[in-house]
Amino acid sequence: MINILEVNETNKMIEQEKLDVRTITLGISLLDCCDSDLDAFNRNIYDKITRLGKDLVSTGREIELEYGIPIVNKRISVTPIALVAGRACRSEEDFVEVAKTLDKAARDTGVNFLGGYSAIVSKGTTPTDEALIRSIPAALAATGRVCSSVNIGSTKTGINMDAVKLMGEIVRETAEATKENNSLGCAKLVVFCNAPDDNPFMAGAFHGVSEADAVINVGVSGPGVIKHALEDVRGKNFEVLCETVKRTAFKVTRAGQLVAQEASERLGIPFGIVDLSLAPTPSVGDSVAGILEEMGLESVGAPGTTAALALLNDQVKKGGIMASSFVGGLSGAFIPVSEDQGMIDAVNRGALTIEKLEAMTCVCSVGLDMIAIPGDTPASTISGIIADEAAIGMINNKTTAVRLIPVIGKDLGDTVEFGGLLGHAPVQRVNGFGCADFINRGGRIPAPIHSFKN
């Protein structure tokens, strides 16, 4: 029986508290598109993406109108291109042509991003992997909707430090290649440890080889809803606090489950997972930082921040997992600086540093995300930050990632405008002491002792 109070509560969550479904992401396998001829390969991937994705945007809009739940993004992820392009691509320029084909497919289907210009090099790098990675700066400069990711480590395999070194250089080169646009290419490039196969969120989404031919994955959001719920229990003990977050996360996830099932049924594509992540936006009131401050912190970055974030992350999982038949992806709280007004404010007031953000990544969903750093930051320093994050992920058996933006021509204290959901960010201080000799050693960091489970 429909309860009018619950109907009103849902309406309030959507209209006043910024509840939305952040993304419907269609994952598409390109394993059957391989060809030794580059033109044929490009034709195969374009045809498959546009055939399966042609109704994604219109279906999302229909569900929005029918149920009144905003669906912010409709996106596509594909099999990591390094796995399928080896026969067709013989040079970096060939890979850039593939990126342009992906970009055209994204435009023609109407999605705002397409992820999967990716390589999985957690234990070693093939010549194809390296060619794709070295093509990333040119590919992101030549496209508007293509997103790239590289997985450089895992708990089972350790960390590929040769790839870590290379990715520091690639981030720098991408910043240079897109410097006319505030180095925006780096906002579409993520370096992972323990990357999941079914992540619906950009820029790190790709369609893993363990997945079906096509699946629908949905990413929910709702920081504003949880913040409003916590306002009603201000000053209560931790038991009440945890229960409130958990119950609210359940309601938010049910909305995502409904949208996922509807999209799956209407498109005739299997439902994959709901990602429980709390994804903020630059809008006032849609902030993960706001939740932490509502718990009692004077500012994000204050002592207690990591504990508050750990509590939030755990209760979101506990509430959300009951609300969906399949949960996956990243599933936790995102802490992107440029996309969260509360994080931006904390950086500006001096409360939040990169080092504190790194500590927070030990207990939350992803990692150092959308952080603007000085444009003259050395590649070896970027590699060192990537290695630190990868170590956290490897040792703790969790996904971690780095999306740093060394903004060419900007320095400490400047503010960079990225626009849209990417927001804006103050340029943050990076530790000035070097780590080049450490990064230049090369080779691999072995997997941790507790990874041997067999």
UniProtKB/Swiss-Prot annotation:
It comes from Methanoculleus marisnigri (strain ATCC 35101 / DSM 1498 / JR1). This is UPF0210 protein Memar_2269. Pfam families: DUF711. Belongs to the UPF0210 family. It comes from the Archaea. Gene3D superfamilies: 3.20.70.20.
